[in-house]
Amino acid sequence: MDDYIAHLPDWQQRICGEVRALIHRADPEIAETIKRSVQPCFVLDGNVCALLATKDHINLFLYDPTMADPDGLINQGQGNATARTIQIYEGDPIRDDALVALLRAVIARNRAGGWRRLNG
């Protein structure tokens, strides 16, 4: 994960570092891994989220397509079958408390059996 982030432009390193810290604030037990040979993922009783840098933004994939988003952070992937996305562009503010709340919701559903089981 450190290597992935280190090779990004400075502004993307800052965003990834801040988001990474918030992910661990949501639950210190979250583990970091690389999936699909390049994608930083965070897991705890299942996939929680993943980061992916693009040319002009960072995608934060949240692995629960059925989760509520009371603060309106999710801005892509509403119709996706497995994840919804928060796209973060250079200069975008990161709403720390709202993001931590979303992450904690995914973790709670993972611990309860995962969104597929809960919605199935």
Question: Language-model segments: what does each one mean?
Answer:
Residues M1-G120:
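Charge-dense, helix-prone N-terminal extensions
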